[in-house]
Amino acid sequence: ERHIAFLRNYDPTIRRLKKYFFFQNKFEKLLRKLKIDLVYFTGPSQYSLYLEDTDFIITIPDVSHRENLEFPEWTKSSEFQRRDEIISKSSVKAIAVITNAEIIKDKISSFYSVEKERIYVINHRPSLGISNFKNFSEDLSIEIKKKYNLPKKYIFYPAMYLPHKNHKYLIDVIKILNTDLKLEMSAVFCGSDKGYLEKIKKYSEKSGQINNIIFLDFVDDEHLPYLYLNSVALTMPTFSGPTNIPPWEAFMLEVPVLYSDIHNIREVYRDAVFYIDPFEPSTMAKGLVEILTNNSKKNELLNNGKKILQSVDEKKEFNQFYEILKKRRKIKNTWEFNN
């Protein structure tokens, strides 16, 4: 459905014909009616292609579809063309592009020929459910354990069920820990399904680990902190990145993080995570054993995670929004009249 909507509107000739016959497309007509002259898109959106007379800012969190062409969710069924057309056409026209790391800023500039001066870096922050978490409730923790049937020891992975998220890898890790190393360990997954979950479940059955895996959908914001806090670690063998929200949430809640060593990720998380090879499950199994048996290493990761959080000046970063607006207003004042 979204691809059809994209095809209907991305072509500039089609948009000009629509504008000629209907004066403006419905979206831009609504913006004019509401007297809105600047739009902020929180992610790549086909609606940015509708705008011909309205300024906009857009967030581009990653360009993974350019780096990992082997994953179907990024390249098959014309998804690559859809993503790339949206980003290529919107990034060069946006008055500002926002992303989450200097590495991604460089890639956006390189892939899409966007001036670096127009790309602003604003780091990820924990979700509101984590940021607003203050006091641990033992009663609520027990209630959540019962509600989700949480095992005694488990690794936690909050991620959509998609191939690039690498859930298959974690099932292999659990098998190594339980079968080869004789450690009792489970995994708790939570996230929305895009049609891939059934394959993951079948693989866990084939591997003999179905009883050691808990599959959840999205969970309530109030419950999310407890899924982190009751876990052994946040495990992220993902092939996307380098910026994702869960590591920041784990840093805030002081939960160890194991993360894929990909895409210059060390520039972002430095010494705050245990780096693993996303192709080799034994590297994560080794990391989990070290976290379980070496308190010094675990505390080092937790302390470094807190340092990364503290190093981000949230107020200074969000002030970049105001700088974008001030720059736009300053330029517009050179040609715009108030009468």
Predicted regions and their residues:
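Carbohydrate transferase catalytic cores enriched for Leloir-type hexosyltransferases
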Residues: 1-339
